[in-house]
Amino acid sequence: MSLGNVGINADYSWDAGERARLLQSPSVGTSPELRRLAGGTSPAGAVFIVVNAALGAGLLNFPAAFNAAGGITAAISLQLVLLLFIISGLVILAHCADACSERTYQEVVRGVCGRTAGVLCEVLIAVYTFGTCIAFFIIIGDQLDKLLGAMMHTTAESPVPWYADRKFTISVTGVLLILPLSLPREISVQRYASFLSVLGTCYVTVVVVVRCIWPDTTIPSHEISSSSSSWLAVFNAVPTICFGYQCHVSSVPVYGSMQQQDIRRWGYIVTIAMFIALCVYTGTGVCGFLLFGSDVDQDVLLSFPSDDIAVAVARAFIILCVLTSYPILHYCGRAVLEGLWLRFTSQEPGEEPSKERRRRVLQTVIWFLLTLLLALFIPDIGRVISLIGGLAACFIFIFPGLCLIHLKLSEIHEHKSKSWWALLSYGVIMVTIGTFIFGQTTTKAIFVDLVG
């Protein structure tokens, strides 16, 4: 996830320094010269980047989301309805980026909706990336449990050695691999993350689809529900869908990097990209649900036997993707926090290197320790996705809707046309839907955590 998905796939084809400048707030010394990209992204390249931003860790949770929604028909129908708003939100953001001449999501929100909305957006981006980093640690623990179990030939009833304990393996992996990759001021690992992420997510989809068509004899048959017990059950899948398709934060700099910044062309690009993401997510969701039914785990790979070699390769791919993506997500969150810090302390960006280094190390260590500690005590990625999926609704619905409303209200017309009223009403509808999704999913997630 990218910062947009902020999931496994979080990479653009730019170097780390350029990405840092694009992610920082306007007050962090981002001059027009530094923000101007050499060349431009082709339409095909833009499609790949948007797909890369959308596909991510949410893929593992889609079969469980299909089960929670009450079956295949309900889940696919919900996806198609939400995709209309997801695609329109991407187009609205590009239109607003043209209107205010900004190149990042938070700058567009700040430029169109004002300072308060911009600060709120930056805070939510930081919280969203923080939550996704927690999900990454949980994914590492899930996959290592299965891989170590296969190597040691242990069963569910076997005692787990101390060196194979989940908390120990997550901690060691984090301290030895993730923390050193997260400390540098600039990150070079992201140039490899894009290829690994796309390859990993596609491989997981292929494995799940193939296992559904030619099931392993060791996988027992499971009950498949054809309808939900209540029409309200369909909302159980909303957080996963929002988390999976959320690429809106990444989309603004992608649009700004295009060779020809045309709204109509951009509409075609994001439609194609979302169709590709729909095929991948739906393929994984449908086949994973048909394989395991109501017994599917929150992470679909956990439902497969430990000794399945093809699935073991998929687990190794996912671990590698997460190891390269956590530093990128932390880097994005740190850039936003750094911008907020410099703005509210009225400091100039050109400070002493030693002071900046101490603050960066302190920020990184605190971020790392908090995400690690929370991941050790959260049982599965479903708990995290159910919470940050509500935040994803803010980036998909609320902020694009607010931008559209402010943009329309800023236009001076003596007589408002029907199209003006239609667009204003659409913005209000987006904000209303986003607020409902955020409130409903967040409240339910907190309630489940407190009760369970």
UniProtKB/Swiss-Prot annotation:
Record-level Gene Ontology MF annotations: L-asparagine transmembrane transporter activity; L-asparagine:sodium symporter activity; L-glutamine transmembrane transporter activity; L-glutamine:sodium symporter activity
GO cellular component terms attached to this protein's record: axon; lysosomal membrane; membrane
Membrane topology value: Multi-pass membrane protein
Alphabetical UniProt keywords: Amino-acid transport, Cell projection, Ion transport, Lysosome, Membrane, Sodium, Sodium transport, Transmembrane, Transmembrane helix, Transport
Domain of life: Eukaryota
Keyword Glycosyltransferase annotated: no
Any single Pfam family the record assigns to this protein: Aa_trans
One GO BP annotation of this record: amino acid transmembrane transport
Catalytic function, reaction form: L-asparagine(in) + Na(+)(in) = L-asparagine(out) + Na(+)(out); L-glutamine(in) + Na(+)(in) = L-glutamine(out) + Na(+)(out)
Membrane-spanning segments: 46-66, 74-94, 120-140, 168-188, 195-215, 234-256, 272-292, 309-329, 361-381, 385-405, 419-439
Compartment(s) where it occurs, according to its Swiss-Prot or TrEMBL record: Lysosome membrane; Cell projection, Axon
Its job: Symporter that selectively cotransports sodium ions and amino acids, such as L-glutamine and L-asparagine from the lysosome into the cytoplasm and may participates in mTORC1 activation. The transport activity requires an acidic lysosomal lumen.
Family the entry assigns: Belongs to the amino acid/polyamine transporter 2 family.
Protein's recorded name: Sodium-coupled neutral amino acid transporter 7
Species for this entry: Xenopus laevis
GN (gene name): slc38a7
